[in-house]
Design a protein with these regions (language model features):
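Conserved AAA+ ATPase small/helical "lid" subdomain
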Residues: 135-152
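Conserved AAA+/SF3 P-loop NTPase catalytic/coupling segment centered on the Walker-B
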Residues: 14-17, 45-72, 99-109
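Conserved nucleotide-binding/hydrolysis micro-motifs of P-loop NTPases
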Residues: 7-9, 32-34, 55-57, 92, ...
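Conserved RecA-like P-loop NTPase ATPase core
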Residues: 3, 12, 18, 37-38, ...
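AAA+/SF3 P-loop NTPase mechanochemical coupling elements
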Residues: 41-45, 76-95
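Walker A/P-loop
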Residues: 1-27
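Short glycine-rich substrate-engagement loop in P-loop NTPases that contacts/grips substrate
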Residues: 22-48
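Conserved AAA+ ATPase core "coupling" helix
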Residues: 88, 102-135
């Protein structure tokens, strides 16, 4: 599944919620993840793979992901290491701001869920729920400050 939407539309919260419910999973931040992804996948062989901001990852990685989704196998030759392993039955959840940055074949492998931009009031409600250890008024205040930065 791919969660698509503007910044601050709770895409990452969905991924983290999935990982919280299903413990056999890994999370990668596509905006600053390195080749360590392949090492982690090879070592852990997770049943759930969550990639935040897949649209910011290089096209070469997106192509490798497509091959993996089609075959369940990772086969990559890099300068320093070769990878050749299987992960059968893994479920993949990703987020992206701009779906057009993914190739059409990769897009076709995902169910798409479009998340709209929050209204300011909804954003404040979410802030109170996401920051439950804080008092409701402090969580709401943080949401207001964040909103003034132009995020919601």
């Amino acid at each position: 599944m791919v969660f698509i939407g503007p910044p601050a539309s709770a895409k990452t919260l969905f991924l983290l919620g999935i990982l919280d419910m299903i413990k056999d999973g890994v999370y990668f931040d596509g905006s600053n993840t390195t080749n360590r992804i392949l090492d982690v996948l090879e070592e852990e062989r997770p049943k759930i793979i969550c990639i935040d901001e897949l649209d910011k990852m290089p096209r070469t990685f997106q192509n490798q992901l497509l091959n993996f989704m089609e075959s369940g196998r990772v086969k990559v030759d890099q300068q320093k290491k070769q990878y050749d392993f299987e992960i059968k039955g893994a479920k993949i959840f990703v987020t992206c701001n701009e779906i057009h940055r993914l190739s059409k074949p990769l897009q076709s492998r995902f169910r798409k869920l479009f998340l709209p931009r929050y209204t300011e009031e909804k954003f404040l409600d979410v802030s109170e729920k996401v920051l439950p250890k804080l008092s409701s008024s402090l969580a709401r205040y943080i949401g207001v400050l964040y909103g003034r930065m132009g995020v919601p």
